Amino acid sequence: MAGITSTVGFNAILAGATKTVSHPVKSKLFGLRLCVPEFSIVSLSPYHHRRCPAITCRYGGGGGGGSRFPGDRRGRQKESEDDDSLDISAIRSATVRLIDDQQNMIGLVSKEEAVRRAEDAELDLVILSPDADPPVVRMMDYSKYRYEQQKRKKEQQKKTTRMDLKELKMGYNIDQHDYSVRMRAARKFLQDGDKVKVIVNMKGRENEFRNIAIELLRRFQTEIGELGTEESKNFRDRNLFIVLVPNKEVIRKVQEPPPKKKKKPADDKVSAANITATQDI
């Protein structure tokens, strides 16, 4: 409940000698709070009128009528702004290159026809390339498109900011098949941007084969190659391990699609019959 504050001045009819109040006067009565600061009153006559300090009254309320939560934005309505990608009126060209909702190229159509087709399909007409000649537009469910875009963006941010640690365990005498399975898993984890910890557990008398386990880990690191770089290792305790960190530069090159080969123009082949006919002429 908002508080009500009021300041009231009044004239008091005082009688008697000088009276000094050395401390503030406060009173609460049925939610009414009275506060009178320190003051002195001198009466010169039994019915002398003397101006008294003002009394500040406050009823109810919290902290001055303000919000209980200073930074609270609840209840604010977000202003919706029209996306430029939907502003078809901004296209000055009379024709556009239209793509349907299945990403099939329809071709050149008038701007009015593109709008009509989108309305008939109950879809949005979105501008993909406003600077192209003619501009490229596409029919789609724009809200769904934006949702998927934001979802992909969040997933990419998680991959760039978060790096999980994946563990791969194997024995010093692991067979080739199991070794290959762990190698493929390590490559996949590194390409996904995660660290890989390769562990070889030495139990009991297996500690005698420590050198074999160390050679196994070094071989594993060598076969990973530039895809992962060594972050840390431990070849002293019973649990031998090596931690590999993804090499982002190498992974980026691996994930890039290979460049398309340019088709060589077919050489004009002249048949022997044509050569013979030319010579006869």
From Swiss-Prot:
Residues 1-51 form a transit peptide. It is found in: Plastid, Chloroplast. InterPro entries: T_IF-3_C_sf, T_IF-3_N_sf, Translation_initiation_fac3_CS, Translation_initiation_fac_3, Translation_initiation_fac_3_C, Translation_initiation_fac_3_N. The keyword Translocase does not apply. One of its GO terms (molecular function) is translation initiation factor activity. Residues 63-86, 253-281 are annotated as: Disordered. It holds the Pfam family IF3_N. Residues 70-79, 253-270 have a biased composition (Basic and acidic residues). Its main location: plastid. Disruption phenotype: No visible phenotype under normal growth conditions. Keywords: Chloroplast, Initiation factor, Plastid, Protein biosynthesis, Transit peptide. GO terms for cellular component: chloroplast; plasma membrane. Belongs to the IF-3 family. Chloroplast translation initiation factor that is essential for the coordination of leaf and chloroplast development. IF-3 binds to the 30S ribosomal subunit and shifts the equilibrium between 70S ribosomes and their 50S and 30S subunits in favor of the free subunits, thus enhancing the availability of 30S subunits on which protein synthesis initiation begins. Monomer. NCBIfam families: infC. This is Translation initiation factor IF3-4, chloroplastic. The lineage of its organism: Eukaryota, Viridiplantae, Streptophyta, Embryophyta, Tracheophyta.
